[in-house]
């Protein structure tokens, strides 16, 4: 299993001005001994070429890569056309950043505040993701939503969207146990679409079940260790990561009869 630790896991430190993306790269590489960066876009200082290329240089110097770019404030759908346009422009900026940084996957939310989708919303969302997929294909990464909030927290909406977009560079960021409908079955229904994952602290008691599900569907991406509390983040992330990794190692040992 490959692991990543989203920079969002340190959003408390970031809000206090105690960590930026350069410090995050150091933290992931030398505190947690990972080569994978998992960037939350709200930690970008700008989209200027000079800044983004400095980030890329910092990654290359540490022999790191970007497993995922997690994009907020760029949701595809909003009922307000002006906000839709604003989010679209932000989405394009982040896709360009993903290309410069060499990201493997990009999460851009579906938007929509309710589980129900109008025909207008669905058609617009499908077409926008098709556009994003064309860019992703050109630059060698996957793109799609997370079951994060609103419309995306219904596995049936995810299924319909995946089938309608119908593109090899489209998939989802699967946030375990984060559904408003089909709460018991959502992960199982949508795991096959996943290109990246978020495993929160509250899912740790069921970590073995989630890891088994990923193996069952042939998942090749990273297990993203996302922490949310904003408190004692270095130690909390260390516990969460170590527990998930130990669970996986015990599962593999059991298979070998060790």
Located regions from the model:
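A short, structure-level motif marking secondary-structure boundaries and short turns
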Residues: 9-11, 39-41, 78-80, 116-118, ...
